[in-house]
Each structure stands twice: as structure tokens, then as C-alpha cells.
Design a protein with these regions (language model features):
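C-terminal motif of bacterial Sec signal peptides marking the signal peptidase cleavage site
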Residues: 18-19
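Trp- and acidic/polar-enriched beta-sheet ligand-binding modules for extracellular glycan
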Residues: 381-382, 409-485, 545
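Beta-rich carbohydrate-recognition and catalytic domains
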Residues: 23-206, 218-265, 280, 288-333
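Short beta-strand segments within Ig-like beta-sandwich modules, predominantly Fibronectin type-III
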Residues: 439-442, 533-539
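Pro/Thr/Ser/Gly-rich low-complexity, intrinsically disordered linker/stalk tracts
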Residues: 481-515, 549, 564-565
Length: 565
């Protein structure tokens, strides 16, 4: 499969656009959004659905290599924007969950969760030529994570349990990764103190969550041990940090946890991730994102810029990460930018029509900003269509097309699942112009962002199926981005944050509904000038149970609409 087949650009367009946030020209193929647009594999059993999760990503010999659970292979990229899929048959444990990789010298090492630990290596991972290492590490690893320190010492971390702690041990890569000493318990469960560790859709269940998916990052001489909680099936799945002065601790809880967290927006979840540096020195976090409708493990991958500094600590930019943002080709200060290109969502709950629909899968599900719901036509025949009315002509920059694979009967192994379609725009609903023509498409891209070379002013947008399909033509998101021509909402009034008197992990928020607002961004942090966490809310009230019991918090709220915020 050629690398060019995975570039996230419209094949009929090329060139650059100007970012509204930076004022700089950005190549189209570097404008992306979440979930990552990968050829997510359908699983071999149960209800037909795609899955990828528990990602790990490292830069090795000029390429980024991305591995994820249940993917039948892995991906590589030169720029974090376009991805080439590499099917893999030479790693017999590839189908086990939670892979980890480690570059040492000219070799990339791999292992995963399995009954008996087995490590593999490959000096040329662009080829499926992995070889087994004579593995001497005897611990049974669940959610393993390699880490190589600057002094050449190598460590293994692991843990995936609602009872057992996150563990760690030094290993010897020159002797089959044999453990050097006894493993140490590093992170225990504390759901009684840290609300975000409590399971449930809103952290409401009276039991311990799962602490899992560790990852180690070193910054300015200190060791940041990351872990995920409380469960992969929840939008409130996130990653937190403990910090210490040595690779095996002792570690202290970071008060501003979780550092990677995305409970709201089109797609939620930002847990069981891996933090890495790109070739320019920028930090990124790749993590699991959640659908969990057809199966608890129905998941996708997300990529988030991460700010790392001695002043502000570590935090991932997530709240606007399912809007268009750009992949930089230079060093960037992520304390000053989240890489957004400045386009607003124009399509939220606008009038929608369709050629047909199934009960429970009405057209409005395609623009309700919930990937968990979708529109499904009655058939997969050519000519099924969905149309959105922006209600007034607006400048459109991009369209995010998310296919839902409704009533598909696809199971691994399978050839690429290819959609063919075209997207039209109209100012009056009568005369239509072709914006994107994918009638000859040969790529498996279920979450593609289409970006125009120059914005077009249209009121109506329509996507039409052009290929006979065995299931139903279906969309979990037909999302239109650009610039409205009206006014942004006014400052939010009547904001109140009330802490529960009996359970201080819980806050309840209310505010006055603002005229013309699409939604609101609620921000918080443990320092007044450091509100690094955020959630998108489409109502004027919100309950959150993911706070620390003993921490004090500061909050702010802003309204947004199609004209800005």
C-alpha cells in the first residue's frame, strides 16, 4: 500500500491555506482532526465494527511508527499527517492487547500483553520481518511499557487492574530483557481521593476503576510516570501522572491530573496513551478515543499536542482537538498555541434532510456532535444522500466525513473497506457545484477531513453515495467548518460552581443560556492562572465528578458559536 494513499488531502486540490490563528501558510495535508483518519480494522468476531486502541508511537530512522491493539499491523509516517499501513504476520502475539515499542540503536523492539512475555525485534520495521528475542523477562505483563533512560538503562512498566498497582522493574536488553531485581509497586488506586479514577459514564459507580496503560516521560531530570483510568469504555477515560526523581520512584501524585482528558465534544476519551517527541522536539500524546456502542472496545485513536514546561507542568490540548488543527513542521511553544486553524463548526443541529433513514438512525444524528449516534440510510445503494442546510450562506473551509459502517458484515481478515461518494455545495439549493469527487476512491478512510484550497460561500451541502454497499450508507458525523458572518456570543453571565457538601469530588455548574451560543467551554485548574483543563458543553448546566477530593479549583467559562468565541 503506497504512502500517498493515506494522506489526508482532497485528491483534486493542492497547495496551502492561511491559518486564522497563526496567520501562516499551512500545507493542506498537514491540517488534520480527531479521530485520526486510519484504516481501522474490523474485528474477527462479535458484531461487525472497527477497533484500534492502546497506542504507542515512536520516531525511528526518519519515520514515526504507530502501533495499536487489534489492528493486524501498524502504521508509519514521515510527518504525523499521512500514514502508511504495514500488515504484519511475523509477530505471533500481535493480536494481544496493548503493544509497546522501544528503539535501541538501530533496532526497534516490540512486546504486548500476553500470558508469557515474548519480545520481538526488527532493524527495518518498514518490512514485516520481525524476529523473536530470547526473552528472559518472566513477569506476566498486562499493558507493558518500555522506557530507555539517558544513561542507557532500560525499564519495563505494566499494570491493568481494578486492584493491583502499576508495577516497574529495570531490565537488561543485552540479556533477553532479564529483570534486574524485584519489581516495585509504583501507583496504587485512590478513587476515594481522585474522582477521575472512579468508573462510570460520569464517574458515579461505587467501586474502583481500572488503573492501566503506563508510560514514562523524563523532563528536566524528573520522571513522569503516566497511567490511565478508570475504564476504556468511558468518555471520561484519561491519563494522569505521578512524578519522581528516579525511574522506579518513589512517586508523588500530580495535583492537576488528569493531564490528558476529553469528556466532551464530537468524540471523547484521551486515555491509555503514549507521550513522545516529534523530530522538531515538540511533545505529543496519542491515546484511545471512545465510541463503545456496538462493543465496549469499539474505539479510535486521537493525537494531541502536549505542553511541557517547568512553570505549567504537563497538559494535553484536547478540547478543540476534534476541530481542524495543523501538524507543525518546526518547533512550537504549545503553552502558547493548541494548533487550531481557527475554523468554527457551522453544521451543529442545522436542518438535515436525507434520501431515506432507518428508525433510530434519523438524519439529525449526523450533525449532533456525538460520534456514538449516526444516520443510516435504508440501503447501501448508489444515490443515497444526506443534505445539511446552514440556514444562511457561509464561508466553508473544510468538511469532516465520518462513516458509521451501519449493518456491515465485515470481519477480519478483510480487504480495504472503501467508500465512494461526492460532496456538493449550493448557495440556493438549486444550482450545485462539485466540491469533492471521490467516485473513484480506492482508500479505506472512515474519518476523513476534506479541506478546500480556498473557502467557498454556500448554504447547502450534500454528500451522495456512489458505490453499491452490502450494508447501509451511514454517517456518524457530517461536520462543516468555516466562518460565520454574524457576531460571537456575549460574555457568559450567571456562572455558578457549587461543590457537593458530602462528596468534594463533585462539582455542579449552572449559567445563563446565552443568546446565539452553540455551546460553552468550561475550563478549570488548581491554579488561578493555569486553567489547562476544558470540556465542551452544549447545555447551560453540567455535573462533573472527576475532581480531587482535597484540591481547590478555579473555573472559567466562555460561549462559542459559528462566528467565534
Amino acid at each position: 500500500m503506497k504512502k500517498s494513499t493515506h494522506l489526508l488531502i482532497a485528491s483534486i486540490l493542492a497547495g496551502c491555506i492561511t491559518s486564522c490563528s497563526s496567520g501562516k501558510r499551512i500545507a493542506q495535508h498537514r491540517i488534520v482532526t480527531n479521530p485520526m483518519n486510519l484504516n481501522y480494522r474490523f474485528q474477527p468476531k462479535d458484531e461487525s465494527r472497527r477497533e484500534a486502541a492502546d497506542p504507542v508511537l515512536e520516531y525511528f530512522k526518519g519515520y514515526y511508527y504507530l502501533f495499536a491493539s487489534k489492528s493486524g499491523g501498524y502504521w508509519r509516517s514521515e510527518d504525523l499527517a499521512g500514514w502508511e499501513y504495514i500488515p504484519c504476520t511475523t509477530i505471533p502475539t500481535l493480536e494481544d492487547y496493548a503493544p509497546t515499542i522501544l528503539p535501541i540503536g538501530d533496532t526497534l523492539y516490540f512486546t504486548t500483553s500476553s500470558g508469557k512475555t515474548q519480545i520481538f525485534k526488527n532493524a527495518h520495521p518498514e518490512k514485516d520481518t520481525w524476529e523473536a528475542v530470547d526473552t528472559k523477562l518472566t513477569y506476566r505483563l498486562h499493558d507493558p511499557a518500555f522506557y530507555s533512560d539517558e544513561d542507557g538503562k532500560v525499564y519495563m512498566y505494566w499494570g491493568c487492574s481494578d486492584k493491583d498497582p502499576i508495577m516497574g522493574v529495570e531490565v537488561d536488553p543485552k540479556d533477553g530483557f532479564r529483570a534486574l531485581g524485584e519489581a516495585k509497586a509504583l501507583i496504587a488506586h485512590h478513587g476515594d481521593k481522585y474522582g477521575w479514577e472512579v468508573p462510570g459514564k460520569n464517574n458515579e459507580e461505587p467501586r474502583q476503576g481500572w488503573n492501566e496503560g503506563p508510560c514514562m516521560l523524563k523532563y528536566e531530570g524528573r520522571y513522569y510516570l503516566q497511567y490511565a483510568a478508570p475504564g476504556t469504555q468511558y468518555r471520561i477515560y484519561g491519563d494522569g501522572i505521578y512524578v519522581g526523581d528516579t525511574p522506579l520512584g518513589p512517586f508523588e501524585y500530580v495535583e492537576d491530573n488528569p493531564f490528558s482528558f476529553k469528556p466532551g465534544g464530537f468524540i471523547g476519551g484521551a486515555g491509555h496513551g503514549h507521550t513522545f517527541q516529534d523530530k522538531y522536539g515538540n511533545y505529543w500524546h496519542v491515546a484511545s478515543m471512545i465510541i463503545s456502542v456496538r462493543h465496549m472496545f469499539e474505539r479510535r485513536l486521537g493525537l494531541f499536542p502536549v505542553a511541557v514546561s517547568s512553570r505549567n507542568g504537563i497538559y494535553a490540548h484536547t478540547v478543540w482537538s476534534d476541530y481542524p488543527f495543523y501538524i507543525p513542521n518546526r518547533k512550537v511553544d504549545f503553552d502558547k498555541t493548541d494548533l487550531s486553524v481557527g475554523w468554527n463548526l457551522l453544521s451543529y443541529r442545522k436542518p438535515v434532510q436525507a434520501s431515506s433513514s432507518l428508525a433510530g438512525y434519523e438524519p439529525g444524528n449526523a450533525n449532533d456532535e456525538q460520534i456514538e449516534t449516526w444516520w443510516a440510510a435504508q440501503t447501501g445503494k448508489k444515490g443515497e444522500w444526506l443534505q445539511v442546510d446552514l440556514e444562511t450562506p457561509m464561508l466553508v473551509n473544510s468538511i469532516h466525513v465520518n462513516f458509521a459502517d451501519h449493518h456491515f458484515k465485515v470481519f477480519a481478515p478483510h480487504p480495504p473497506v472503501v467508500y465512494q461518494f461526492f460532496i456538493e455545495g449550493s448557495a440556493d439549493g438549486k444550482k450545485w457545484m462539485n466540491l469533492f469527487d471521490e467516485r473513484e476512491n480506492g482508500k479505506d478512510e472512515p474519518h476523513r477531513l476534506f479541506t478546500l484550497d480556498k473557502p467557498v460561500k454556500v448554504r447547502y451541502l450534500r454528500i451522495c453515495n456512489a458505490k453499491e454497499m452490502d450494508g447501509c450508507f451511514s454517517l456518524s458525523g457530517f461536520r462543516v467548518f468555516g466562518k460565520g458572518e454574524g457576531a460571537a456570543p456575549s460574555k457568559v453571565t450567571g456562572f455558578r460552581a457549587i461543590r457537593d457538601s458530602e462528596d468534594k469530588r463533585i462539582f455542579r455548574f449552572t449559567w445563563d443560556a446565552q443568546k446565539g451560543a452553540t455551546g460553552y467551554v468550561l475550563r478549570w485548574g488548581t491554579q488561578k492562572d493555569k486553567l489547562t483543563h476544558a470540556v465542551t458543553v452544549f447545555d447551560n448546566q453540567y455535573e462533573a465528578r472527576y475532581f480531587n477530593r482535597d484540591s481547590e479549583y478555579y473555573f472559567s467559562i466562555t460561549a462559542f458559536n459559528e462566528n467565534g468565541n
